């Protein structure tokens, strides 16, 4: 059968996910957001590919009857750190029905260690069962060792060597009459 992948992300980056999947994959992306979300969701279920949706939209869709999801990607996963929130519960339900799950976040630990432990627990419950009294792990290398199977931290220094050479392009444009007038006035007024 077809591969069934879902990307759940904030609305502000849905288009970026669409563009990157089209650019780097042969999988068909489906924008499951906006007025045609139901139709796109049905089409994705029938054809396979990558459904790209938002946290708000996924809560409205009827996904209870979904077969197994091959891969669930949760971008900005810190949005689901509160286990009592409806958004979090929806994502946790999808997580349980997914063969593979990838939580992406630049801020896994915003306020309390328990928030990160909660996210890790959705991916590897065995790890967090060992860490029930998480206070003892704050700032410790033991905590880092415990979560290592599910946590990859990349700093800018780690990836700088993997990036392509910086390309700078200068493009000079001429102002129109009105734009030139606004510019000169802005320069005069400092």
Where are each of the predicted segments found?
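Conserved Walker A/P-loop ATP-binding site and its immediately adjacent core
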Residues: 2-23, 110, 114-115
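Short glycine-/polar-rich loops that comprise or flank the Walker A/P-loop
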Residues: 2-3, 27, 97-100, 114-115, ...
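Conserved nucleotide-binding/hydrolysis micro-motifs of P-loop NTPases
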Residues: 12-14, 37, 57-58, 107-111, ...
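Conserved helix-turn-beta segment of the N-terminal RecA-like "Helicase ATP-binding" lobe
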Residues: 13-35, 123-127
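Conserved helicase motor
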Residues: 31-39, 55-60, 81-84
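Conserved motor-coupling elements within RecA-like helicase/translocase cores
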Residues: 38-51
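Inter-lobe coupling linker of SF2 helicases/translocases
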Residues: 52-58, 63-68, 86-87, 92-99, ...
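Walker B catalytic acidic pair
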Residues: 75-76
